[in-house]
């Protein structure tokens, strides 16, 4: 035995989303998950946000493989965009493999052969790491915890999990396997923190199935139900509920079709009733229709957003219809979703969420389930992941109350030594966020996004100056504010503002007026003063200086004479 066993999160710590974790021994590495997250108001105009893999890209020849715990976007979504930077085998079970093959193909990545399909419970070796995927229940089929044997001891990486005694799709959590792995205690438990602040248990999908069937039977008009496209059990529940209520079920949204196809390929959804294509609805009465649509988080291009705003080519909602949100609001999406709810209500649609009716159970463990996992594993070290900072600290406090020796709360980029010796952060590696702009990856800290945020908050003012070769103004400055000031107020004072800018330029010396930088600074300062902009108002001021030579002026004059 030599070296150290270290754990390095590149994403997924201090946040919910973008999970990507590294385990290393002697500079040999395995990666667990490679997910993305979705942009918020801090990245205007952006959609997908991916992790910066610079640290491991520089060591790609020492990266032994990627292990995927399950097929949620925050765990696999970055693979189609970043796998080519790594080029190593991807190890996962059947359903994640089916989803990944489709995602890689859709993104033009012809490397599906890189996927190694693993069987839960069967160990495989990657250098000094003996790995075994162990089935756990989650809100998606074929989810797994990762059991890792190392020369320094055992580590259990839980992934996303819960204890559901009656899962509707897929198998129960492999309690026997977990108990066996933790029988002698483990070195470290790296565990899901999402619901650590919620007492009790997370509930069973079977209970939601009964509730949704009853709810859909009661509805009179057209029903639109949205949920996470990857929640295969919920999709099956919704389809069965609609079918039993005498409704034709219509599936709308590319990601939902992709997930259903992958589930069928993997042997799930055997009880799925027949569904209609949205183009084949024909003369089916509205009260006999149920649309199963994407967009449970208010995604701008998803089906529900287009339906709510009347932009969908085939689906229209009317007063008396019902929209059921069979999902939880992901933190950060509240404002977008409330706006979506309001838009639906304005159309006369009844909106039903988990606050109104029992339509959702979480796919993550609540406190009682987390405590049970600690009893099975009896870890020396607890490393909280998959949660915001408040979740991580609550998880660490819980672990300490349960007798764990140490429960460090770390940040993305921290290199945490797990063994040998005392647990400590021994260094920090490069982390960050990349934004997918069309087909290009842009650093989230780029000026592009600072400029967009400033434009959103403060607007812009464009000034065009036309000067002759001596620096004299040939025309009055043309000033165009966009979103920076109230337009009527500006119009009332435009002549005075223009005059003050002209005066400021004329006060420059003969030498200064020939220096574009000096002219631009003078105009910026003068404009702020002339418009009375407060210090906190910082519009982007774009000064365009056009200098015309005598030849250009003569040519312009000749052209005017010719036209006359």
Regions found by a protein language model. Give the residues of each.
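Short glycine-rich phosphate-binding loop at a beta-alpha junction
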Residues: 89, 383, 542-543
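Hard-cation-handling environments
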Residues: 197-326, 330-355, 359-512, 520-521, ...
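Short, well-ordered strand-loop elements centered on a beta-strand within folded domains, enriched
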Residues: 7, 30-31, 157, 249, ...
